[in-house]
Every structure is written in C-alpha cells, then in structure tokens.
C-alpha cells in the first residue's frame, strides 16, 4: 500500500508540472519597478523613451545572470537568456510616460533550485517509473492479501 501511495504522490504533481510549462504572464509594470516572475527571477522596466521605446532588464538573483532587451516598440518582442533558459519579452502597450503592459513567456522552472529543470523536462520518464512502482505495489499487495 505504501508503494502505491508513493507512486501516486509522484505522478499527480508531475502531471500538474507537465501542464504548467511554459508560463505566460501579462501585467502592467511601472518604470523602475521590479517584479518577480518565478523563483529568483525578476524583471524591471529600465527605460521608457518618448512613450514609444521600452528597455526591459531580467535578472536571476540566485546566480547574478542579467540580460536586457534593448529598445523595443509596441508589438515587438525579444528573447532573453537567463541561466541558460529563454524568456520571451513582448511589449503589448505603452500606457503613459512610465507604465508599460508587458507579456513574459518563460519555462516554469527558471529561478528554481538546481535540478528542477531535470524533473520537469524528464517528467514523462518519471511518470512511467512511478506508474511501474504503483503496478508492482498493487501486484505485491494483491499477492500478500491472497496468501492470507
């Protein structure tokens, strides 16, 4: 029974993680306001020029990785690399002199402790192994019950 519960405790969270990546977040951000995307990764609108061009910086506080978009206009996007992972930044709208509507698309595990990406990228293998553990546990439990 314990083996079956162990298998279920791995499969269910694994299914949730597999359906959650990549993440998309759209929100309004004020110039020089820092917002957390996920884990230790934060983003900041560093400059809004003439209500047209926007510069955004993304930082991983854990390892100090930093990348910047350069100047983007409304409708443009840029791919930034943080800790080896790609974060897509798209400017949706410049609302006024210092407010910007931005869409971020990123892997769920960016900024998580090391090893998280291994779990999420190999989730299919983990689910197969956990299912095998559950089946073996069910067979073993059925065998033990039938002996009594």
Swiss-Prot record:
Chief localization: host cell
Entry keyword Transmembrane helix: yes
Record-annotated membrane-spanning stretches: 119-139
Membrane topology: Single-pass type I membrane protein
Leader sequence residues: 1-18
Topological domain ranges for the Extracellular compartment: 19-118
Domain of life: Viruses
Keywords: Host membrane, Membrane, Signal, Transmembrane, Transmembrane helix
Residues exposed to the Cytoplasmic side: 140-148
Record localization: Host membrane
Keyword Metal-binding carried by entry: no
GO cellular component, one term: host cell membrane
This protein's name: Putative transmembrane protein ORF23
Organism the protein comes from: His1 virus (isolate Australia/Victoria) (His1V)
């Amino acid at each position: 029974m314990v083996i079956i519960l162990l298998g279920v405790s791995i499969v269910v969270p694994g299914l949730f993680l597999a359906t959650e990546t990549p993440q998309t977040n759209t929100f309004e951000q004020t110039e020089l306001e820092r917002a957390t995307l996920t884990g230790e990764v934060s983003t900041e609108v560093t400059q809004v020029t003439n209500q047209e061009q926007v510069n955004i910086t993304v930082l991983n506080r854990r390892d100090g990785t930093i990348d910047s978009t350069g100047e983007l206009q409304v409708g443009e996007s840029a791919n930034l690399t943080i800790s080896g992972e790609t974060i897509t930044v798209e400017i949706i709208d410049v609302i006024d002199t210092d407010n910007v509507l931005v869409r971020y698309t990123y892997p769920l595990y960016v900024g998580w402790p090391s090893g998280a990406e291994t779990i999420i990228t190999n989730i299919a293998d983990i689910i197969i192994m956990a299912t095998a553990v559950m089946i073996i546990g069910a067979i073993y439990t059925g065998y033990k019950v039938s002996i009594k």
